[in-house]
């Protein structure tokens, strides 16, 4: 059992570093978003979603909004996993009600990508981090993030989100050299992006591997584990001991291999991961994050409260960050979020 840490200035950061707290710190994936009326008001002031991401004044405002409403332990910078392909020069847009749309990448198009442009193009994100950092209370953790290479590649190849990632999986099998080159580009771009986020004030970063499902063990090792391992190592070569949360959604039985090989400080669990499996299969001192079903939060009521309490109890003997198993959905009533935070804050 990891000893309970003495009170620290940033409970969430302390937890990521392996210290149990008296109660789990909490943040919520997509906590700055459409379920908040104040977010919708800001969103209406800008022309496009990417414009919101690249306007530091507005991006900092929406980053801070959920912390004004709820006693959350962290802010996560408002951005998107697809800012990297945008920075690389791929055409990226967001259609209302349809999600992201990209010009699909081809093997021939890889040479047109501009890895050297990433940090310059994403300077507004770093300014947003600096603005948020200056406004945060000292006990709040600031989280940066990026999409992991496999997940970002699925969008770059298909041109949109895909529930089975078939286009990317087929591309990887039929064009292995081009796919390996694409992953290399994304690894290096991600390292540069995350290092710059740390230097702009991020306390911890999260790697979003949102599409880790639908891969066999060999593909998972090559497309998920190895690129994420390289990113963590590359970031720490410049920012020693940089704290990293990995979130390989849908990894299921391959979670232990990911945890062992990638080198993340904490492991995000989706809501399909049984608590007993996580406790039995993962190292006892490894911090975990999660894993309430977002639909339980949207539905609210006693079922949500009981499941939240079960998760807190289930991970009571290891460092635990309370979160959802995926992003909060827009239909979620703000009252349900307030009730969840209340339950977590009382520690049971």
Which residues make up each language-model segment?
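General structural signal for secondary-structure boundaries
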Residues: 11, 48, 103-109, 116, ...
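A gly/proline- and charged-residue-enriched helix-loop-helix capping module
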Residues: 97-135
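A short acidic, glycine-rich active-site loop
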Residues: 52, 111-118, 171-174
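N-terminal small/glycine-rich loop or linker at the start of catalytic domains
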Residues: 19-51, 81, 87-96, 103-106, ...
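Generic low-complexity segments that are intrinsically disordered, proline-rich and/or Lys/Arg-biased
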Residues: 4-7, 26, 101, 241, ...
